[in-house]
């Protein structure tokens, strides 16, 4: 396996180091190449993501990312120039966010054993394509537009992926949208879900408006198995799912090219937390859980299961203790 590693900013390098410690314990011999991308490189060279680096990344089987973001860089520069460019250049059209409440984890819904779902979010369309603009800026008559792009091709490929995952899980899929207001995109999503669903007669299909889905995710999260949704709604509902499952610090994600033409990228969804960087207190659990997603994506199912079970054992016994960053990695690696 050839793995590209982007530690990034803030606590990113710290949590990534512990994730690699666990990866080495469960699957020794991975060929790793580290890339210096983020605020430090931007300040030193003015570069965000050179074309040459993109070409190098394409030669890897997967990418492990720590975190990107620094207050010394204007808002949006790193996000669009690095994170979103990676997503679009490598065609990461599937954003995968598992939501599971592990035993022993503190949550508003702690003790509910039925919280185990996955959100399949479209990753390269919607309002994040940068289409839109503004006129009469700074005047009382300013007009700003953000265009949400939804293509049949883009919707279909993420819907097919969601149905495949539902078939392997509990055979239930929920489309989350706002079809009563966003009628054009809503009809496209609804029609394609219905069309694809005919090829999966064993998968039960449901629909929820995004506002209703947020209510049910809190009051009855056990109803969800696989959720498929667009880029914007997925961005919102996955953070709610993280809160339901114990917080953003336990949220792993995968940015996936379903065609496997390009390497997929796996990362914890928490930010770079520059205020605690270098203190050794950042929780690397989400980064370690991202390694489990990475392994599963590359067909290393046994290794992925071992990591997931080691994390589960660690969380079940941790209680209110908050070990140092390196200690978390050492405990989980030792359990392997």
From Swiss-Prot:
Subcellular location: Cytoplasm
EC numbers, comma separated: 1.1.1.85
PROSITE patterns, alphabetized: IDH_IMDH
Swiss-Prot/TrEMBL keywords: Amino-acid biosynthesis, Branched-chain amino acid biosynthesis, Cytoplasm, Leucine biosynthesis, Magnesium, Manganese, Metal-binding, NAD, Oxidoreductase
GO molecular function: 3-isopropylmalate dehydrogenase activity; magnesium ion binding; NAD binding
Chain positions of site Important for catalysis: 128, 178
Cofactor: how and how many bound: Binds 1 Mg(2+) or Mn(2+) ion per subunit.
Principal place of residence: cytoplasm
UniProt catalytic activity: (2R,3S)-3-isopropylmalate + NAD(+) = 4-methyl-2-oxopentanoate + CO2 + NADH
GO CC terms, sorted: cytoplasm
Protein residues bound to substrate: 87, 97, 121, 211
Alphabetical list of Pfam families matching this protein: Iso_dh
Domain of life: Bacteria
Keyword Membrane attached: no
One Gene Ontology biological process: L-leucine biosynthetic process
Cofactor (UniProt): Mg(2+); Mn(2+)
List of residues binding Mg(2+): 211, 235, 239
Sequence positions that bind NAD(+): 271-283
Assembly and oligomerization: Homodimer.
Family, as annotated: Belongs to the isocitrate and isopropylmalate dehydrogenases family. LeuB type 2 subfamily.
Protein role: Catalyzes the oxidation of 3-carboxy-2-hydroxy-4-methylpentanoate (3-isopropylmalate) to 3-carboxy-4-methyl-2-oxopentanoate. The product decarboxylates to 4-methyl-2 oxopentanoate.
Name of this protein: 3-isopropylmalate dehydrogenase
Organismal lineage: Bacteria, Bacillati, Actinomycetota, Actinomycetes, Mycobacteriales
Encoding gene per record: leuB
């Amino acid at each position: 396996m050839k793995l590209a590693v982007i530690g990034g900013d803030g606590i990113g390098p710290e949590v990534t180091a512990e994730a690699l410690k666990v990866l080495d314990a469960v699957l020794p011999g991975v060929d790793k190449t580290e890339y210096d991308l983020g605020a430090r490189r931007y300040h030193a060279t003015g570069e965000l993501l050179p074309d040459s680096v993109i070409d190098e990344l394409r030669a890897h089987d997967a990418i492990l990312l720590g975190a990107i973001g620094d207050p010394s860089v204007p808002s949006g520069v790193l996000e669009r120039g690095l994170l979103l460019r990676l997503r679009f250049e490598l065609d990461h059209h599937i954003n995968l966010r598992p939501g599971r409440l592990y035993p022993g984890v503190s949550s508003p819904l702690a003790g509910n054993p039925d919280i185990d779902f996955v959100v399949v979010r479209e990753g390269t369309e919607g309002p994040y394509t940068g289409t839109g603009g503004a006129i009469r800026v700074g005047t009382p008559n300013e007009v700003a537009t953000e265009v949400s792009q939804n293509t049949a091709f883009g919707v279909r490929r993420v819907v097919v992926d969601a149905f495949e995952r539902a078939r392997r899980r509990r055979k239930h899929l929920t489309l989350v949208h706002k079809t009563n207001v966003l009628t054009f995109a809503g009809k496209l999503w609804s029609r394609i879900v219905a069309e694809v669903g005919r090829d999966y007669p064993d998968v039960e299909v449901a629909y929820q408006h995004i506002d209703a889905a947020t209510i049910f995710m809190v009051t009855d999260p056990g109803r969800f198995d696989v959720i498929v949704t667009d880029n914007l709604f997925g961005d919102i509902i996955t953070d709610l799912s993280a809160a339901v499952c114990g917080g953003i610090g336990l949220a792993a994600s995968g940015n996936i090219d379903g065609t496997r033409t390009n390497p997929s990228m796996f990362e914890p969804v928490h930010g770079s937390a520059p205020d605690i960087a270098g203190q050794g207190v950042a929780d690397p659990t989400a980064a370690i859980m991202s390694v489990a997603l990475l392994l599963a994506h590359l067909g290393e199912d046994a290794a992925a299961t071992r990591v997931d079970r080691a994390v589960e054992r660690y969380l079940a016994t941790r209680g209110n203790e908050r070990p140092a960053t390196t200690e978390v990695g050492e405990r989980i690696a030792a359990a392997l």
